[in-house]
């Protein structure tokens, strides 16, 4: 179920502070975040975030198309190694 419109988007407070500090400094450094549940806001466009996937921080360059989505959508947590092949079918 979607979040109620009257509540507004969810963003962790520390994330807003880090984004504002990064914009003020003018440096294009990666902002490390653990909050995969936070919504991407328009003020984050152009910034690079390192989103933690449980193993390492994956760099995510925020574009206008990402606004309204969650950070976790752009940092996959699982690696698909493929299905095992059927040995009987290969022998043919």
Curated annotation (Swiss-Prot):
Keyword Protein transport among UniProt keywords: no
UniProt record, GO biological process: ribosomal small subunit assembly; translation
Molecular function via GO: rRNA binding; structural constituent of ribosome
Gene Ontology CC: one annotated term: cytoplasm
Keyword Lyase: no
Record's keyword terms, sorted: Ribonucleoprotein, Ribosomal protein, RNA-binding, rRNA-binding
Pfam family membership, one: Ribosomal_S19
Protein name per its UniProtKB record: Small ribosomal subunit protein uS19
Organism encoding this protein: Gluconacetobacter diazotrophicus (strain ATCC 49037 / DSM 5601 / CCUG 37298 / CIP 103539 / LMG 7603 / PAl5)
